[in-house]
């Protein structure tokens, strides 16, 4: 501790890296299991190894770090376990694209050679992510870091797959899947981005066999007509009742298909007749099952028409569409083409339009897994913060479909299913078989597909702690405490972790799910590569420091709500850090440790001392309660307001006369108060601004070697001083009001003036005891107290405050004639501006043609000018 030897300026580059290295060296983030302490565990949502971290990661990890640092200081045995996700398809696409730059093709390389390249990528990007998290100040235990493809996590994946298979919950079946024709794999819903695009409805005639009649259908995908198995109408639709059971000639083919009746059809939508293509549409698939229709798949894995497509065989789906529409028109079967805006799903990694296609995949039966996961949330075994996101969770879980877990990729956990090529036996065991368990043949091969990335991610809370082995970490730290994540993956990840935890561990994996929103740009747009509005958190850290970025991400952040990234707010955060630095340096440069020790038990406090100590105590209670309720943004705002305004702007300024004076005892008392308040403030600020608080604390405090392991302040009801807080509230309002009054009258702070105060009974003590504070902070030459307001000089201007009324003599402050002249000029100018705005807004052409934002801006100007004019008129009246 060396309170004098601290840098004169706040420069985070000087200490952030040094401090983090010291934290790691001292193993502050690596918990040793201590059963005398309560565990508090957060398992970090694993970022994908596909590139650098973005602002969303910075927000997610800042919130987690706040909670971990808070609980660590509260004395919990805290574990924040970091890691990364192998991100199967995302990583495979990235590596493929990199290899293409070298002229290398995945399929030509072969599986093993390609996977070697992926592991090289993995090692590089895991290290990058690790370093980025450290730069953000994340107090995670990197000695326990996990990766979804680690040996033990792969072992956990194998155990769960085998368990589910033997329980009859994993099966292989033909169902509709989201298919990427470019990557040639099934996709999860999370890997699809939907965008509104202009398209068409093609209205096509389907002739009724043996009749002159036809049925008109409308479709956005005419190329799938080749796989139609029926046309459906609603059973209540009288227009088509006579056609139900009849056969239709399927255009462009030599097949006939039936007209069926099904409640799925919306009478009001389109023509009320719907082509049913069970192999190419999820809704049609369900209709087809109900009516036992054939599933005719007319596209191959690359989106090209297959051998069932007749003359269109070998054409890409869009080329086939073009040719088929032309042929339909030539045959007189194309009724019309109607423009139509609809949502089109594309693969988020390669941008290819996704094709719903029937394919043979591995699935998990979900109903029996979902039911207990619904109950645990309903019974508050796991709580969502905010609670409204329970509806999102229930909505998905109560309408859950079986989960497609196979992917036609190379990178990932290979499906542990083995086939005997001689007798067809299927083997699913914990160890790879060497021969067929049925016929003894050694001619066996493993399923070529890999598991959906979310399969391994679903096991993250317990696989990272050593499961399926009963490790000490698993016994002590599971179930975990809080999961912090975005609302966009409640379905894909949160729900799957809950049912996986219950099914494999017998209990929910976490007590609380803290949901945050996404980060948008200043205009409220989602950040994306296409918009070019993304922000690299490391660039922000390089310019402003990690603390400023963290502060900006948390202030104003309410659970579940999106936040906007506004560069000026990061600058404001850095200004706050700078103010804390300068105030702390001022305190430390003036502290006399000997006098502190000499008078540490002296409690001859001034009103300001009593007030700031009481406010500090109240702040401890409020901030602790906010943190416990996950109101992290509110907690931070309170600490900010206290340190900036109450401590820096008021208390430090009020005690400067004591610091510069000769009263040794008064100095000793103030030194102790300054130390106590600053030390406490640093601790309350530490969870969100770890670097600056550590650097100041190590120069200031003698408690512990690091604020990281310091004790969180505790509230002491005995330290409450309501009277001091109330009295200082009167004084501070008086100071603010006097400053505002002087500013309105253009009086410089250097010009002192007498203040006369008429105080109510409850405020008398405050003004008597705090008169010196008005002199110090409100430029009062002296303060006198009035018993009544009778016979007051007309040459006074007054302001009403809570607790009384304050009077200033005009002659002491302004040249009345000059000020009236200035105000009248201002009045004329404002009247002109108001006239200009009103004229503009009365112009109908301007209001109708100008952008709405411009019109609103003019209206706002008009309101502002009128308010300013009103204030000027009041001031003129006062001077006259």
From Swiss-Prot:
Catalyses which reaction(s): tRNA(Val) + L-valine + ATP = L-valyl-tRNA(Val) + AMP + diphosphate
Keywords for this protein: Aminoacyl-tRNA synthetase, ATP-binding, Coiled coil, Cytoplasm, Ligase, Nucleotide-binding, Protein biosynthesis
Cell compartment(s), UniProt: Cytoplasm
UniProt-listed SUPFAM superfamilies: Anticodon-binding domain of a subclass of class I aminoacyl-tRNA synthetases, Nucleotidylyl transferase, tRNA-binding arm, ValRS/IleRS/LeuRS editing domain
E.C. code: 6.1.1.9
Keyword Plastid found: no
Record-level Gene Ontology MF annotations: aminoacyl-tRNA deacylase activity; ATP binding; valine-tRNA ligase activity
Entry keyword ATP-binding: yes
Gene Ontology process terms (BP): valyl-tRNA aminoacylation
GO cellular component: a single term: cytosol
Residue window of motif 'KMSKS' region: 526-530
Pfam families named among the record's database cross-references: Anticodon_1, tRNA-synt_1, Val_tRNA-synt_C
Domains (record comment): ValRS has two distinct active sites: one for aminoacylation and one for editing. The misactivated threonine is translocated from the active site to the editing site. The C-terminal coiled-coil domain is crucial for aminoacylation activity.
Family: Belongs to the class-I aminoacyl-tRNA synthetase family. ValS type 1 subfamily.
Stated name of the protein: Valine--tRNA ligase
């Amino acid at each position: 501790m060396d309170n004098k030897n601290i840098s004169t300026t706040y420069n985070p580059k000087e200490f952030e890296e040094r401090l983090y290295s010291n934290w790691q060296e001292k193993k502050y983030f690596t918990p040793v299991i201590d059963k005398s302490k309560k565990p508090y565990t957060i398992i970090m949502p694993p970022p994908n190894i596909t590139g650098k971290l973005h602002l969303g990661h910075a927000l997610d990890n800042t919130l987690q770090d706040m909670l971990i640092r808070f609980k660590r200081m509260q004395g919990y045995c805290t574990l924040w376990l970091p890691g990364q996700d192998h991100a199967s398809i995302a990583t495979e696409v990235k590596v493929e694209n990199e290899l293409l730059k070298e002229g290398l093709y995945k399929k030509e390389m072969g599986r093993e050679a390609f996977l070697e390249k992926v592991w090289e990528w993995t090692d590089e990007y895991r290290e990058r992510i690790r370093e980025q998290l450290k730069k953000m100040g994340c107090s995670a235990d990197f000695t326990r870091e996990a990766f979804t493809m680690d040996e033990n996590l792969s072992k956990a994946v194998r155990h769960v797959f085998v368990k589910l298979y033997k329980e009859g919950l994993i099966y292989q079946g033909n169902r509709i899947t989201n298919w990427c024709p470019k990557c040639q794999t099934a996709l999860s819903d999370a890997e699809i981005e939907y965008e509104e695009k202009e398209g068409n409805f093609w209205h096509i005639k389907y002739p009724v066999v043996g009749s002159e009649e036809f049925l008109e259908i409308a479709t956005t995908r005419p190329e799938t007509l080749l796989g139609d198995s029926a046309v459906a109408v609603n059973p209540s639709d009288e227009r088509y009742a006579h056609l139900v059971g009849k056969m239709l000639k399927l255009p462009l083919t030599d097949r006939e298909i039936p007209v069926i009746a099904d409640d799925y059809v919306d009478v009001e939508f389109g023509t009320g007749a719907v082509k049913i293509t069970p192999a190419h549409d999820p809704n049609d698939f369900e209709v087809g099952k109900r009516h036992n229709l054939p599933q005719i798949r007319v596209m191959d894995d690359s989106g090209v028409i297959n051998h069932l497509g007749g003359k269109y065989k070998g054409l890409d789906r869009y080329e086939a569409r073009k040719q088929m529409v032309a042929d339909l028109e030539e045959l007189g079967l194309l009724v019309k083409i109607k423009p139509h805006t609809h949502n089109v799903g594309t693969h988020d990694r390669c941008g290819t339009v996704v094709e719903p296609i029937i394919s043979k995949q591995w699935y998990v039966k979900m109903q029996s897994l979902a039911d207990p996961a619904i109950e645990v949330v309903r019974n508050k075994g796991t709580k969502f913060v905010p609670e409204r996101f329970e509806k999102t969770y229930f909505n998905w879980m109560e309408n859950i479909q079986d989960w497609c877990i196979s992917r036609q990729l190379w990178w990932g956990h290979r499906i542990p299913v083995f086939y005997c090529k001689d007798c067809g036996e299927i083997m699913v065991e914990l160890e790879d078989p060497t021969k067929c368990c049925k016929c003894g043949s050694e001619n066996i091969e493993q399923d070529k597909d890999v598991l959906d990335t979310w399969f391994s991610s679903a096991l993250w809370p317990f696989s990272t702690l050593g499961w399926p082995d009963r490790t000490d970490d698993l016994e002590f730290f599971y179930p975990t405490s809080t999961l912090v994540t975005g609302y966009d993956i409640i379905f894909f990840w949160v729900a799957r972790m809950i049912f996986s935890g219950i099914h494999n561990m017998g209990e929910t994996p976490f007590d609380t799910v803290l949901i945050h929103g996404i980060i948008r740009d200043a205009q409220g747009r989602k950040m994306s590569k296409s918009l070019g509005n993304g922000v690299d958190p490391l660039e922000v850290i390089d310019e402003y420091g990690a603390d400023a970025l963290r502060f900006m991400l948390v202030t104003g952040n309410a659970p579940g709500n999106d936040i906007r990234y506004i560069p000026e707010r990061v600058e404001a955060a850095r200004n706050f850090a700078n103010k804390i630095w300068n105030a702390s340096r001022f305190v430390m440069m003036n502290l006399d440790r000997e006098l502190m020790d000499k008078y540490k038990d002296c409690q001859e406090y001034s009103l300001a001392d009593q007030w700031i100590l009481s406010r500090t105590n109240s702040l401890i209670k409020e901030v602790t309660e906010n943190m416990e309720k996950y109101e992290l943004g509110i907690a931070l705002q309170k600490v900010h307001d206290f340190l900036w305004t109450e401590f820096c702007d008021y208390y430090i300024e009020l005690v400067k006369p004591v610091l510069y004076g000769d009263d040794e005892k008064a100095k000793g008392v103030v030194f102790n108060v300054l130390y106590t308040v600053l030390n406490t403030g640093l601790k309350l600020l530490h969870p969100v601004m770890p670097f600056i608080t550590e650097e100041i604390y190590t120069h200031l405090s003698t408690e512990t070697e690091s604020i990281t392991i310091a004790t969180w302040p505790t509230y002491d009801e005995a330290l409450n001083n309501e009277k001091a807080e109330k009295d200082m509230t009167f004084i501070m309002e008086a100071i603010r009001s006097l400053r505002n009054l002087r500013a309105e009258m253009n009086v410089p702070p250097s010009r002192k003036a007498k203040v006369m105060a008429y105080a109510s009974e409850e405020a008398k003590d405050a003004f008597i005891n705090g008169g010196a504070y008005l002199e110090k902070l409100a430029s009062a030459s002296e303060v006198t107290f009035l018993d009544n307001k009778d016979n007051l000089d007309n040459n006074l201007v007054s302001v009403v405050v809570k607790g009384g009324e304050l009077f200033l003599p005009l002659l002491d402050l302004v040249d009345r004639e000059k000020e009236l002249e200035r105000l009248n000029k201002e009045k004329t100018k404002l009247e002109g501006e108001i006239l200009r705005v009103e004229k503009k807004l009365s112009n109908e052409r301007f209001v109708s043609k100008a952008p709405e934002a411009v019109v609103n801006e003019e209206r706002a100007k008009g309101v502002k000018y009128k308010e300013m004019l009103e204030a000027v008129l009041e001031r003129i009246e006062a001077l006259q």
